[in-house]
Design a protein with these regions (language model features):
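Transmembrane-helix motifs of polytopic, lipid-linked glycan transferases
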Residues: 171-193
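Aromatic- and kink-enriched transmembrane "portal" helix at the membrane-lumen/periplasm boundary
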Residues: 152, 198-220, 246-252
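Membrane-lumen/periplasm interface segments of specific transmembrane helices
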Residues: 287-378
Length: 461
C-alpha cells in the first residue's frame, strides 16, 4: 500500500514539474511575442500612422477628455455621474504613444516608449500633446516603465484605419465575444448562470467600455479566457496555463484599469463547470484551485512587468528602476492618509468609494455601496434556511463557499493598490463585476438548494 502511494506521489510530482516547465516556456514565448509586436509597430511608416491620427483629430477635439456615455449619465453630480464617464484622457495618451517614434532604432523605441509633449510632461494636456505628435517640432519624453502594448496595437491599426473605424472593429469584437461567452456558459452550465453573467456586467455599466478600448481590453482578455476554457473542457493543469497567459497579457495590454477581472471572471466560470462535472469535489479542492490559479496569474502579471523593466534597463543601458520604484510606490502608497487617520481607514474609504459607483445616480435608490450588503444579507438568510431544512447538498455548500472566497479578489486589489484605486475609482469600480457575479451565483445556488424540487432541474440538472 505504501509502495503504491509512493508511486502515485512520484507521478504527481513529475506531472507538476512538467506543468511548471510548460508554463515557464509559454511565459517566455509570450514575452518574445510582446517584444516582436512592439518592434514591428515601431518599424511601420510614420506617415501612414500620422495621417490617420490627423484625420481622427476632429473626433478627439469634439469629444473632449471625459465625455459621458449617454444611456445612464446625468450632469447633477460629477462623483456619482462618473459611473458613465468615458476615459478619453488615457485614450489620447495611448494614441500619442502609438504616433510617436524617434525613427532612430525600432528596438530602442520599443523599450523607450517615446511620447510627444508641448510642456515636457504627458500629464499636462493629452489633447494638446496628441496634436503636437502630428507636427514636426515637439518635446519628447519617455515612459520605459510600462509595456504600453495597447499603444503598439493602436500604431498597427492606425497604419490602416482612422479612430472611428478602429472603434467599430473594437465594438464588433467586444460584443461578438460577449455573445459567444453567454452562449458557451448557457450551453455548458445553465441559462440562468448566463443571465447572471450579463446582469453583473450591466450593473457596472458595461456599455461605457464599448466607447474606450483602454477600458475594455481587460474584458476582451477575460472573455478570451472563458472561451479558451470551454474550447476543450480544460482541467486543472490546462486552466493554470490559461491563467499564466491571462496574467502576462493583462500586464502587456492594460494600464491599471480593471486587471483583476481577467483572473476573477474566468476562474468563477471554471469552478462552476468543474464543480458541476465533479472535477472539484470538496472545499479543499476548491481552495487549492483558487490558490494555484491566483499564484499563476499573479506571477505571470508581475513577471511580465519585471521582464519589461529588465529588458528596458539592458537595451537602453539605463537605470530605470528609480522611475519604476516611484510609480509602484504611488500605486501602493498610503499618501492618502493625510486625510485619513490611518491606512485601515484609507482602505475602507477606497472600498466604499468604488462600491458607491456601482449604480448610476438615476437608479441609486438605497445607496449602491449597500447593494453588495443587501445581496450578502439575502444570501445569509437563504443559507440559514438551507441549514434549518437540511436541504442543501454538501457539494453545493462547498461551491458556494469557494465563490464567496473568490468574490473578495477586488477587495484585496483595492487594499493593496489603494493609492491608485482611491483616485481612479470612476473606472476601477468595474473590478467589482467579478464580486457581483460570484455573490449572485452563490445566491442562485443556495436558492436552488433551499427548494429541493427546483434543485434537480436547476444547477445539478
Amino acid at each position: 500500500m505504501d509502495f503504491y502511494k509512493y508511486q502515485e506521489m512520484n507521478i504527481m510530482r513529475k506531472i507538476t514539474e512538467s506543468n511548471i516547465i510548460k508554463n515557464i516556456k509559454v511565459f517566455i514565448i509570450l514575452i518574445c511575442i510582446f517584444c516582436l509586436i512592439k518592434i514591428f509597430a515601431c518599424v511601420l511608416p510614420s506617415d501612414l500612422v500620422n495621417k490617420n491620427v490627423q484625420d481622427s483629430w476632429i473626433e478627439f477635439e469634439r469629444a473632449g477628455l471625459y465625455p459621458m456615455e449617454p444611456l445612464v449619465s446625468s450632469t447633477e453630480n460629477w462623483e456619482r455621474d462618473s459611473y458613465g464617464q468615458i476615459d478619453f484622457f488615457t485614450e489620447l495618451i495611448m494614441i500619442n504613444f502609438a504616433n510617436t517614434v524617434t525613427g532612430n532604432n525600432p528596438i530602442s523605441d520599443s523599450m523607450r516608449n517615446p511620447y510627444s509633449s508641448v510642456q515636457n510632461a504627458y500629464e499636462y494636456n493629452p489633447l494638446e500633446n496628441l496634436k503636437a505628435s502630428t507636427m514636426e517640432n515637439h518635446d519628447i519624453i519617455e515612459a520605459p516603465q510600462y509595456w504600453w502594448g495597447l499603444a503598439a496595437l493602436y500604431r498597427i491599426l492606425f497604419s490602416i484605419f482612422t479612430y472611428d473605424q478602429i472603434l467599430i472593429i473594437y465594438k464588433f469584437i467586444l460584443y461578438l465575444m460577449l455573445f459567444c461567452c453567454f452562449k458557451k456558459i448557457a450551453d455548458n452550465l445553465d441559462g440562468k448562470i448566463g443571465m447572471i453573467f450579463i446582469i453583473s456586467l450591466l450593473i457596472c455599466n458595461f456599455f461605457v467600455v464599448a466607447y474606450s478600448p483602454n477600458l475594455g481590453i481587460t474584458f476582451i482578455i477575460s472573455f478570451a479566457g472563458i472561451l479558451a476554457f470551454f474550447s476543450k473542457g480544460m482541467d486543472h493543469r490546462d486552466f493554470n496555463l490559461i491563467m499564466v497567459i491571462m496574467g502576462a497579457t493583462t500586464a502587456y495590454l492594460d494600464w491599471m484599469s480593471t486587471p483583476i477581472i481577467t483572473y476573477q471572471i474566468p476562474v468563477c466560470i471554471a469552478i462552476l463547470y468543474m464543480g458541476k462535472n465533479g472535477i472539484l469535489k470538496n472545499i479543499k479542492d476548491y481552495i487549492f484551485f483558487l490558490v494555484k490559479t491566483a499564484l499563476g496569474w499573479s506571477l505571470a502579471y508581475g513577471g511580465a512587468l519585471l521582464m519589461k523593466w529588465i529588458l528596458s534597463a539592458i537595451i537602453l543601458n539605463e537605470n530605470i528602476f528609480t522611475i519604476v520604484r516611484n510609480r509602484v510606490s504611488a500605486g501602493l502608497s498610503n499618501d492618502g492618509t493625510a486625510q485619513f487617520k490611518n491606512g485601515l481607514e484609507y482602505s475602507i474609504a477606497t472600498i466604499k468609494r468604488n462600491m458607491s459607483n456601482l449604480l448610476p445616480d438615476k437608479l441609486d435608490i438605497i445607496g449602491s455601496e449597500y447593494l453588495i450588503i443587501l445581496i450578502l444579507l439575502v444570501l445569509c438568510i437563504f443559507i440559514l434556511g438551507s441549514f434549518c431544512r437540511r436541504s442543501m447538498k454538501i457539494e453545493l455548500i462547498d461551491l458556494t463557499g469557494a465563490l464567496c472566497v473568490l468574490s473578495l479578489a477586488p477587495i484585496v486589489w483595492y487594499i493593496v493598490f489603494k493609492g491608485h484605486t482611491y483616485i481612479h475609482f470612476w473606472f476601477t469600480y468595474r473590478s467589482l463585476i467579478g464580486m457581483i457575479m460570484c455573490l449572485l451565483l452563490s445566491l442562485l445556488i443556495v436558492a436552488e438548494g433551499l427548494f429541493k424540487e427546483r434543485t434537480q432541474r436547476g444547477f445539478n440538472s
